[in-house]
């Protein structure tokens, strides 16, 4: 019996591959409006501060490959073939869908490398993928709205956080706080009933409970430079507030809305948040990002296989 082939559409934000890409990348994010030159120079300086460019492109590709390998290791009913589609730089989501179509893929599971649902993120990825498939006449794409509650994903973060707190002397632990964060979005999503903020709060509670952490708070980071209000509190403001009002002197940052080392973590956390902790004389900690950790890849594989199984009747 010939094993069935299914597409694995891995979608992610994308990042500039070289400094020359920065302008066009951010122009795409801004819906075709070129960023002011001052902003471009600021972005270039941020990338240089983390070593030149973000490691995200390489990590995303490696995550997608490892996920494909893992899916084909843990079951033998179907052969998953991976296609990478990015939101703001090539290969675009539409390019990946076109390649699937050209390869004769009839069915695919689409997963976005972001755990929480929002209209700005997950929905926009999934809609672009489905629109591209509809235009081409296939494949059928089974999309995934969120996977923040996948047990192995929560386990990954709980283990990382627990290890940091366990290594602290008891007196330090008593005055330590966990800050769980994700990328801020415009506040208007709340009026639209978007579940994004609630999902982050749920994630934070589950991780703190599993890690046995008594003190935790939810913050937002990396807000866009636009006049409209964004979700808060910002993690830097939250750090100062927790220090001034609660007297915490050790801060553990878990940017769980992200899945890899990239600018928002390596700069916004490791440089900007760290500067705040240094200003107030506090300690800074940040667990390792999931990247290609086997437990995290297993979490993604579980999510994909559950979604594939939900469509089981169609596979007969």
Swiss-Prot record:
Similarity field: Belongs to the ferrochelatase family.
Known EC number: 4.99.1.9
EC top class named in words: lyase
GO terms for cellular component: cytoplasm
Cell compartment(s), UniProt: Cytoplasm
Key words of the record: Cytoplasm, Heme biosynthesis, Iron, Lyase, Metal-binding, Porphyrin biosynthesis
Main location: cytoplasm
Catalysed reaction equations from the record: Fe-coproporphyrin III + 2 H(+) = coproporphyrin III + Fe(2+)
Residues in the signal sequence: none
GO terms of biological process kind: heme biosynthetic process
Lineage start: Bacteria, Bacillati, Bacillota, Bacilli, Bacillales
Name of the protein in its database record: Coproporphyrin III ferrochelatase
Domain of life of the source: Bacteria
One Gene Ontology molecular-function label: metal ion binding
InterPro entries: Ferrochelatase, Ferrochelatase_AS, Ferrochelatase_C, Ferrochelatase_N
Protein source organism: Geobacillus kaustophilus (strain HTA426)
